[in-house]
Amino acid sequence: MESTDVNHSTAWAPGGMAHIISEAVIAGSIGLYFWKKISALEQTVQELQSQLEVQNNQLQWLIQQQTRRLAVSPLAVSPLAVSPLPPQRDYRQQSTTTNAAGNNGAYPSFQFKPPKTAIKGDAAPPQATPKMQCDNGVCKLVRPLQATHGKGARAPSPEKKTVSISKIAKQIEFEHDQIAPARTATTQVSTFSKPSPNPVLRSITPNPSIGEGRDGDESGPSARALDKILNDIDCE
């Protein structure tokens, strides 16, 4: 019995040691992995802390610069530093006072006089009222002509004016009648009254299967068909 127990212990000893070694290797690798991760996290935390410190320093510097600018801003300048403008003198009032006192002032006053538009002895022309004038059943208001001012000016008579207008109207009508046919002739566009033929390609040469007429007569069906085609072309 003792020999059998010794044999069993010697047989299982290498397998048990290998199992223990593998477990130790696995535990060591897991510990190494977590240690690397923790060290990487610590490094990132340190970098973030350094960046925060730099940003805080920049903000403090900007705040200091802003306070300095506000302290030396142009709004803080006292109003006493700006000298007030001297009062402006009223030269018109001074000139009137000097002239009233009889002294010759440095700035004499000038009286403005409007230009004379009307000539002496000329009165305003009376406003003419329009009159009703009827001609061939058509009535219209006609304003009478007013006499012009000045010597030698003469108003035309209404008869001459109406005659000249009627002549111009007749001349315009005559020219319109003479020009209208020429314009219509140039503007008219000539179009085809007949519809265009069907664009079908036809052979002008006679069909060899039909042949000529009997006894060399050329007035057969092929010649008649050719004449018909030529007549259609001439008509178009």
UniProtKB/Swiss-Prot annotation:
Keyword Transmembrane: yes
Coiled coil: 36-71
Signal peptide: none
Segments of skewed composition (Polar residues): 93-102, 185-195
Membrane topology per record: Single-pass membrane protein
UniProt key word Signal: no
Alphabetized UniProt keyword annotations: Coiled coil, Membrane, Transmembrane, Transmembrane helix
Ranges of Basic and acidic residues composition bias in the record: 225-236
Transmembrane portions of the chain: 15-34
Subcellular location: Membrane
A GO term from the CC aspect: membrane
Stretches the record annotates as Disordered: 83-113, 185-236
Protein name: Uncharacterized protein 124R
Organism: Invertebrate iridescent virus 3 (IIV-3)
Lineage: Viruses, Varidnaviria, Bamfordvirae, Nucleocytoviricota, Megaviricetes
